[in-house]
Structures are given as structure tokens and as C-alpha cells.
């Protein structure tokens, strides 16, 4: 099962670590990694040109919002109503089981669950919770 909607990973300065991309590669889930022009070649060497989208701007000083908006517009231009958007620093996926957070390797199931709920509820934004353990 491949996701019904495109997956984007926004990234800057992490062409070597590529944590989220590696997680998705392990389970053969297709994605695009979205980067600024000055890092495009570095990401292409790491991931292959077919996976890398080059932003039409660089160093705007506005955080990740312009890149997120680019992904939204890119997905809409391809005819998608929804898309997945991930940061580039996800090491693991987890879910709550009996009140405890457990590592979850069934990422495809999680994507399918979100897709089904988006289609069923017709909400504009639906996604995953970020959890950082300190």
C-alpha cells in the first residue's frame, strides 16, 4: 500500500542524516524532500534527483512556512486535496498502547488511518502529534 496522498519532507542542512527519509525508505514509502536551491545538489547526491524538489527561494528568514506553503501548492497543482508534510528530524514513529507510548513500525497503517479519517471527516488539517523525549 502506498499512500493515496503525496508525502513531503521539508529539510535544510540535513542531507547527511535524512532521518525521516530513512524511516520512509525502510518501508518503501514514496516521498519528496523539499530543499532550498543552495542545497539541492547535496540532497540529490544523497537521495537521487527523483526524490528532491527545489524551492524557488532561499534563506527568506521566515522559518519553514514558505516551504510548507510550497508543498501545499505543489500538491494542489497535482490535483490532490490533501498531502502529508513531515519535518526532516523524525527518528521513530510511536503510538499510544494502554496509556504508554510504544515504538510503531507500521507507519503505512498510520498513514492509511489518517487518510481514511481525512476523507471521512472532510477536515482541512489532520495529522500526527510530535513527541520529543528529553
For each feature predicted by the language model, list its residue ranges.
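N-proximal low-complexity "stem/linker" segments adjacent to membrane-targeting elements
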Residues: 1-26
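Conserved catalytic core of nucleotide-sugar-dependent glycosyltransferases
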Residues: 93-134
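Soluble or luminal CAZymes and related metallo-dependent hydrolases
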Residues: 16, 63-67, 105-113
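Short amphipathic alpha-helical segments and helix-helix/interface helices
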Residues: 20-24, 44, 72, 111-115
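Structural alpha-beta junctions
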Residues: 25-32, 47-53, 113-124
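Active-site-proximal specificity loops/subdomain of glycosyltransferases
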Residues: 35-86, 91-104
Amino acid at each position: 500500500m502506498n499512500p493515496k496522498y503525496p508525502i513531503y519532507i521539508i529539510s535544510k542542512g540535513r542531507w547527511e542524516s535524512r532521518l525521516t527519509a530513512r524511516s520512509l525508505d525502510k518501508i518503501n514509502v514514496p516521498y519528496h524532500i523539499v530543499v532550498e536551491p543552495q542545497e539541492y545538489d547535496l540532497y540529490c547526491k544523497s537521495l537521487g534527483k527523483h526524490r528532491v524538489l527545489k524551492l524557488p527561494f532561499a534563506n527568506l528568514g521566515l522559518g519553514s512556512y514558505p516551504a510548507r506553503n510550497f508543498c501545499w501548492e505543489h500538491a494542489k497543482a497535482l490535483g490532490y486535496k490533501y498531502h502529508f508534510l513531515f519535518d526532516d528530524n523524525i527518528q521513530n514513529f510511536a503510538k499510544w498502547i494502554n496509556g504508554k507510548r510504544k515504538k510503531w513500525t507500521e507507519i503505512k497503517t498510520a498513514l492509511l488511518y489518517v487518510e481514511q479519517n481525512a476523507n471521512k471527516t472532510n477536515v482541512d488539517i489532520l495529522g500526527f502529534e510530535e513527541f520529543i523525549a528529553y
